[in-house]
Amino acid sequence: MRYIKFFKELNNKNVNLVGGKNASIGEMFQELVPIGIKVPDGFAITSEAYWYLLEQGGAKQKIIELLENVDATEIDVLKIRSKQIRELIFGTPFPSDLRDEIFQAYEILSQQYHMKEADVAVRSSATAEDLPDASFAGQQDTYLNIKGKTELIHYIKSCLASLFTDRAISYRASRGFDHLKVALSVGVQKMVRADKGSAGVMFSIDTETGFKDAVFITSAWGLGENVVGGTINPDEFYVFKPTLEQNKRPIIKRQLGNKTQKMVYAPRGSEHPTRNIKTTKKEWQSFSLSDEDVLILAKYAIEIEKHYSKEAKQYRPMDIEWAKDGESGEIFIVQARPETVQSQKSKEESQVFEKFKFKNPNEKKEIILQGRAIGSKIGSGKVRIINDLEHMNSFKEGEILVTDNTDPDWEPCMKKASAVITNRGGRTCHAAIVAREIGVPAIVGVSGATDSLYTGMEITVSCAEGEEGYVYAGIYEHEIERVELSNMQETQTKIYINIGNPEKAFGFSQLPNHGVGLARMEMIILNQIKAHPLALVDLHHKKSVKEKNEIENLMAGYANPKDFFVKKIAEGIGMISAAFYPKPVIVRTSDFKSNEYMRMLGGSSYEPNEENPMLGYRGASRYYSESYNEAFSWECEALALVREEMGLTNMKVMIPFLRTIEEGKKVLEILRKNNLESGKNGLEIYIMCELPVNVILADDFLSLFDGFSIGSNDLTQLTLGVDRDSELVSHVFDERNEAMLKMFKKAIEACKRHNKYCGICGQAPSDYPEVTEFLVKEGITSISLNPDSVIPTWNAVAKLEKELKEHGLTEH
């Protein structure tokens, strides 16, 4: 056949003939199907067929005339001309020989699947589409559940006409593509019955930070167009590549989306071949993929990335669409294309750490809305709410676009915006891809944004605070911090990072670092669990109906309270451990005080009213107590899951506020019973050296544990007898006090005697350069810092070590 190529005949060398999308499907058919990756079969109508059609009745010359002198920024003119061109294409009949070939290929495909008329997806594939430096995200149309020759011909024509929507013309013009040097091929692919299963998009790289070792998967019930088009908030999953390839099960994040609707087949004879129906409560409260499905998809992503990288002779992260057949249970890859944002960063750019931050971080800001952050920038300006494309020309340069959902038709408008906010959408929808590509901060899935905000309102949009994006009332000044990482000198003293929020881990891992010196378990409980641990252990007692309902809503998607707690904690710790892998990540077990636990959901039923919570029921004393030990055993299970199931053996454990040797033995026994034993699979167990007794009896504690991390905050408080929360005596609280320096020195010397680890994770090194200098001179193993202190402290330590070496004074 002259104008038809079956997928098995194609590969990536055929882009000019069948476009990027079809060439890529052919490539997978030839190279990846043989190794077990499933791809639905089909055929491509070549770009030669497109030119053949335009030759009929002088259509090509008429298109040239209509596009002459069109300015892509003149939206009204663009709309009129694009409509005229599409009508021209629709009015041009297919030559009979071309139509006959299409019908013959469709019959062959139908017979292959033992069907009279196969249900197919009809997808556009532009010859300039899906190239590494341009996503063409959604620029041409896709139609699902097309059945029969009449429908097939109609929707193929619709695809060809979609090459001349106003958005597609604008996009090509902005990228310097000649309109009549970009041709369109059409792919016809057997449908996967995802209407009875689920579908979505995955990336073989983290889309926001460029972290290379994670697969990011989005998923929803039904056909995948709702995920791609951003009309729902999908489920999200992250899988860690290195340990997945070691046959571990490293699902390091699960996030339940609301999935309010799903796209299914419409009855035959309907106006449209698909329709959206509401999901049931059970569907939106359940994950749309099982863990097994998530791991299969991640393995597919790794193999696809490896193949395309090998072919390109360079690292090539991929953007992949997938579908799960609800009848057979099989998972199929339906498209794969190069990722177009993170992969295009130059080597020089990757050597620069760039961070957007507020000029006055301590200034109080009112959060009015939040959603999923796209990018890592900050934008501010006046709101412009636009509910439909007809009013797009009212949008002014520098305004903040607020709408229900930005599909690629909005691209000319998005280019002018200082930020974008949508009611609906996930991080892999077309709008998110385009926002990243043009470098505009966007927050998607902000429920009720168009109702809560109003045109003319001044707001600030921040995507610089992790995966959650925040909308603040008012304008707040921001600045950009840029650091040349290539200029950083290596240090002997290890520089670690303190981290409490797993969502920031991928970004923080790009700072110069040797690992994580303090990952705070209690912050993960606070932000991920939100309920008091004992309120989960004891779900059916001591609670109001309201509290019980709130807890059950938090648990949606998980089998029971224990499953929720253990997996959520493991995901948080896993995310941090994966971000810094294989560098050490020291996780401190929970260290909330009774007054802090009391403020959590359901907490008032389980906590005593203490006169002095700072010195009361906290740290190790909780772990073996009759009232709390079951909750602590769940914590231990989560830690064991990270090491054993996820394979993240770089994670180490640290026990806080350990008062006596006897307590130490009790805690070690609980850890052992939960498969956490020093030396087993490289595990090290440290304690916080934060009580004077830890220093006084350092040799005894170090006979039980693998090292110390000095907690300078509590150690200063308890050595100087100062309540660190009291303003009245705050002037006395000073880690530079001579007594404190002696405490630090004794702790370091004890660890050296036992040849064991000694770090510091308190606030002192972040605040006082002279404390850092003292610790380096004493030969401390590591200094763990808040992220904003890492770069200046690193440079100071490197300079100091150089001076010490020159004078022969180094302690290392």
Curated annotation (Swiss-Prot):
Cofactor(s) of this protein: Mg(2+)
Instruction: Indicate yes or no for the key word Metal-binding.
Output: yes
Note on domains (UniProt): The N-terminal domain contains the ATP/Pi binding site, the central domain the pyrophosphate/phosphate carrier histidine, and the C-terminal domain the pyruvate binding site.
Which family is it part of?
Answer: Belongs to the PEP-utilizing enzyme family.
Top enzyme class, one word, equals: transferase
Q: Does the keyword ATP-binding apply?
A: yes
What does this chain do?
Answer: Catalyzes the phosphorylation of pyruvate to phosphoenolpyruvate.
| This protein's name | Phosphoenolpyruvate synthase
Residue sites binding Mg(2+) per the record? E690, D714
Task: Return the EC number.
Answer: 2.7.9.2
For substrate, which residues are the binding ones?
R520, R588, E690, G711, S712, N713, D714
An example of a GO molecular function for this protein is: ATP binding
Which PROSITE patterns does this chain map to?
A: PEP_ENZYMES_2, PEP_ENZYMES_PHOS_SITE
Keywords in alphabetical order = ATP-binding, Kinase, Magnesium, Metal-binding, Nucleotide-binding, Transferase
- Species of the source: Helicobacter pylori (strain ATCC 700392 / 26695)
Q: Its pathway?
A: Carbohydrate biosynthesis; gluconeogenesis
InterPro entries named in the record = ATP_grasp_subdomain_1, PEP-util_enz_mobile_dom, PEP_synth, PEP_util_AS, PEP_util_C, PEP_util_CS, Phosphohistidine_dom_sf, PPDK_AMP/ATP-bd
Question: What miscellaneous comment appears in this entry?
Answer: The reaction takes place in three steps, mediated by a phosphocarrier histidine residue located on the surface of the central domain. The two first partial reactions are catalyzed at an active site located on the N-terminal domain, and the third partial reaction is catalyzed at an active site located on the C-terminal domain. For catalytic turnover, the central domain swivels from the concave surface of the N-terminal domain to that of the C-terminal domain.
Which residues are named in the active-site annotation?
H430 (tele-phosphohistidine intermediate), C761 (proton donor)
